[in-house]
Amino acid sequence: MAQLPQEFLTRMQDMLGDEFDAFLTSYDAPRTAGLRVNTKKCRTEDFPPLVPGMWKKIPWIPNGYFVPDGMRMGQSPLYAAGVFYLQEPSAMTPASRLPIEPGERVLDLCAAPGGKATELNARLKGTGLLVANDISNARAKALLRNLELFGSENVLVTNETPAGLADAVSYTHLTLPTNPRV
């Protein structure tokens, strides 16, 4: 298992209680890789025939697949074309579960590198507005690149502090905080 700081372990034990041992065991499990199909460029069910392999759907993500062991999807021309986004399956969950509808205005305060933002934008179906922010200029540039690669529309990329966007919160239907505890 990886060497983890004691302060982190104590905090996690307090938060997880009886599930703490399972959490520690998870560090010894093989890494699970996933990808999310860009439904603006490819229907989910049309993806597996494009790349031969043993594809298995991620049950809780409508447009997600587990990446088969040994596949190097980051080198695929389809990745370079924005047909899919490489993302840990658990990281796909927030954007797929948020209660947003086409036409709404969404503010993502911590949007880089673009996993959530590209999915939220796809769910808006070319309507409404996504304000995708990151406080880091370098990360905001990576965010912009991924949004462009995905063919995102009706999106505004900002490089601002959350306090600097405080007035925007009242304009949006949904705001994703920088800290899940907020």
Q: Where are the predicted features?
A:
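S-adenosylmethionine
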Residues: 1-176
